[in-house]
A protein has these predicted regions:
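Helix-turn-helix
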Residues: 3-37, 41
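Short, basic, alpha-helical segments at the C-terminal edge of helix-turn-helix-like DNA-binding modules
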Residues: 44-50
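C-terminal peripheral helix-coil segments that are non-catalytic and often amphipathic
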Residues: 70-78, 113-129, 148, 158-178
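All-alpha amphipathic helical-bundle segments outside canonical DNA-binding/catalytic cores
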Residues: 65-66, 106-111, 128-144, 163-164
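Short, solvent-exposed amphipathic helices
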Residues: 45, 56, 103-114, 118-121
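Hydrophobic alpha-helical segments that form the core
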Residues: 86, 91, 136-155, 168-175
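Hydrophobic alpha-helical connector segments
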Residues: 41, 55-86, 138-145
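Amphipathic alpha-helical segments used for helix-helix packing
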Residues: 67-68, 82-103
Length: 178
């Protein structure tokens, strides 16, 4: 996954994959098929890891607003410093391949829908607890948060300070809660 993350799909050559996996050409093809199949497996793992993290952050074991704050703080952490400069495999892949590769487009679209659903669930729990501001609809707020965090991943490549990113995340969430 790291090679694709660092170089992108088109920038990754077979020798890069052989070095990273420590497999021979024949073993790599036997294990994964081809470069595209290996890339899709790497992308699937990245997505699964992100969704599992969201399940922990936004799950019912946390108060909804606390979970939302934890979720946003996690994104701020991942978009700050060297992590921010590295960027997001999903965003980079969307920019590089989503318009040309149906398999990739479907996976990324599915991820964004799943993220939106998890956020809408937490926001619905907050609404039921009387913690959402008047007029805030969970589904709309969830879409806004998805756009915000993915935009934060892009802006993170330019090196904003963690303090600035966290203040922006807090200001946005504060618009949604009481």
């Amino acid at each position: 996954m790291g090679v694709f993350w660092s170089r992108g799909y088109h920038g990754t050559a077979l020798p890069d994959l052989l070095r990273a996996t420590k497999l021979s050409r024949g073993s790599l093809y036997a294990a994964f098929g081809d470069k595209h199949a290996l890339f899709l497996r790497a992308l699937d793992r990245y997505i699964a890891d992100a969704l599992a993290r969201m399940d922990v952050e936004l799950g019912p074991r946390h108060a909804p607003v606390d979970g939302l704050r934890t979720f946003l703080a996690g994104y701020v952490d991942r978009t700050s410093g060297s992590s921010g400069r590295r960027g997001c495999l999903l965003v980079a892949t969307a920019m590089e391949l989503a318009g040309h590769d149906g398999d990739v487009e479907g996976r990324i679209g599915g991820f964004f829908k799943a993220m939106e659903a998890k956020l809408a669930g937490a926001l619905s729990r907050a609404k039921a607890a009387g913690e959402l501001a008047a007029g805030v609809e969970p589904a709309s707020a969830a879409r806004i948060l998805v756009c915000f965090v993915e935009g934060l991943r892009v802006v993170g490549k330019t090196g904003p300070t963690r303090t600035t990113s966290q203040a922006t995340a807090d200001a946005l969430l504060d618009r949604f809660i009481r």
